[in-house]
Amino acid sequence: MTGSRSKRNKTIVVTEEEARELSPRILTPRDISGGLSFADTLVNGDLLDVLGLLPDSFADLVIADPPYNMSKKFGAAAFSAMPDGQYEDYLRSWFRQVCTKLKPDGSLYLCGDWRSSSSLQKVMEEELTVLNRITWQREKGRGAASNWKNGMEDIWFGVKDPGHYYFDLEAVKLKRRVLAPYRDNGSPKDWEDTPDGPFRLTCPSNFWDDVSVPFWSMPENTDHPAQKPEKLMAKLILASCPAGGVVFEPFAGSGSACVAAKKLGRHFIGVEIDRDYCLVAAKRLRMADSDKRIQGYDGVHFKERNSP
């Protein structure tokens, strides 16, 4: 899992020695067949094999980032694009059971791109009440000679009970620089004068343009081809999981939701089929023992894109 890299490259890799050290932190379906205690847990296995071993109604929040409906390699595995109806059947093969893991007041976020978004909405509406669709702007992405560059992804937000679910608006307000700092009788009007300049706290919308996709110079970067930013996961977790609650990440990949949950004082259960990605996630979780920082979040408010 290592190779020749620039000294400035901060991508997280796992050495053979680290793999031996980290392996005891990763469970298998056999390890949890007698029941799972809710110490923070990372399980290496096929989601369909693991779901039946997990109790119902344990998660305050589910963040599901399944393979999008495109042909793509994920480590040793690969996913192939398929007709929409077949992709929806694939989603149903695990989504219904994942929803049973939510508490009665739980929330679920389901990630996708423009190709899969309509299928995600359709399948989610069969099990949950859809409250919103978040669209977030990616900085990465290839241009196209005869089409618009694909620079957006979607996250569908659903709940079990639309009359009773957790949502903490104050925890996810965005700290934005004020370009026209008007004053009222000499005092700031709806903004705060700080040593760094004028800022205003704004309510988050369902369009996010303040998230940076991890790249080689960021300390959270990994070799996973579809890694989600910790900042993005932190927004979902702070909004929809109370302190001390449980976050379930059924397609953990390199563990962004699990890591963000740990840094923010939540518990987590992550399931990932690829052993190498489990090791990367385990290393990130170990790093989070001593470093709770999340880029773009100061511990109180979220900052604009590319803020430290």
Where are the predicted features?
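Long, positively charged, glycine-interspersed low-complexity recognition regions
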Residues: 279, 287, 300, 305-308
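Short, conserved SAM-binding/catalytic segment
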Residues: 28-37, 282-298
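Core catalytic lobe of class I
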Residues: 1-22, 26-280
